[in-house]
């Protein structure tokens, strides 16, 4: 999930924590399949070291803006504890929603 259309922060990539947040909402409203799909994507973003980044710049909205941000501020934040926390919130939301249904 992206922050907003036209985002250029590190190219406007997909945000791990926002995707997990959306999955948590989906679980809360009963869309368990959608929530599981978001969880699968989030978990596919773990590095070999077990880190989750702030965002993923594989398919940026503004590819020409990735390099300027990296040159100015360095690589995308990783690990980002907020992403890790939202992953756990989504896992819990899915577990709780599955137990109710």
Regions found by a protein language model. Give the residues of each.
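Extended glycan-interaction surfaces of carbohydrate-active proteins
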Residues: 1-16, 37-101
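Phosphoinositide-binding peripheral membrane targeting modules
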Residues: 34
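Conserved small-residue packing positions in alpha-helical repeats and bundles
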Residues: 20-23, 88
């Amino acid at each position: 999930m992206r922050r907003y259309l036209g985002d250029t922060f590190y190219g406007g990539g997909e945000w791990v924590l926002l995707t997990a947040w959306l999955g948590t909402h989906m679980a809360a409203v009963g869309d368990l399949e959608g929530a599981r799909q978001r969880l699968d994507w989030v978990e596919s973003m773990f590095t070999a070291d077990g880190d989750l980044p702030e965002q993923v710049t594989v398919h940026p909205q503004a590819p020409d803006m990735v390099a300027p941000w990296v040159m100015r501020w360095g690589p995308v934040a990783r690990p980002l504890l907020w992403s890790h926390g939202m992953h756990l919130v989504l896992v819990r939301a899915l577990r709780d929603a599955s137990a109710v249904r």
